[in-house]
Amino acid sequence: EEEPQLVKLEGPDAIKALHTYGTNGIMVEIEMRLAPKVDYQQLIFCHKDWNTIFDWTDDFARQDHFKRRLITGFENPIPQYFKGLVKHFEEEEHVTFILISTDQSDEAKALAEAAGLRLAYDRPLADPPRPPYITDYTWNHTTLWALRADPTITYLQAGFGTDYKAKMEMLWEKFPGESLMHIEWTAGNSKMNQE
């Protein structure tokens, strides 16, 4: 710009500038609201039946009282690509990653156990973090791990809307054996209230 603008972003509007992947401005002043520190626990649950673990994870994501930063589900064989964590999984298991407030982790583990899920990984998110930590395997990191294992994989990101389970099943029917699901539960436009 010939005449630089002063743009003030507050609250949710600031999120628009977080992942812009390039220099698009110079910050001249930053104000941050502080909140109490939350200690997080990294939990990984497994089950050999996709519907069992998916339904449990979806239900868990909709429970508003949990303070969590991450809820991710991986269809088998995606977890087999995760060097550093693969030793915690059995070969045919689907997995769910949860990053949850440490003081609520026992409740999450009890719910998972009641649903027949296996707890495969239970570690605090240390300060500073020490690998392996589950955030290194989620979002676009998942694709990088998969491509390291199999460079022929194609990646497609999709937003399914509110009837996402039916749309996933439709993909499996139309493309049997060709679609593997990696699901990130987000606050976004859903009814879920994530921290």
Predicted regions and their residues:
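FAD-binding subdomain of flavoenzyme oxidoreductases
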Residues: 1-61
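C-terminal substrate-recognition/cap domain of FAD-linked oxidoreductases
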Residues: 58-195
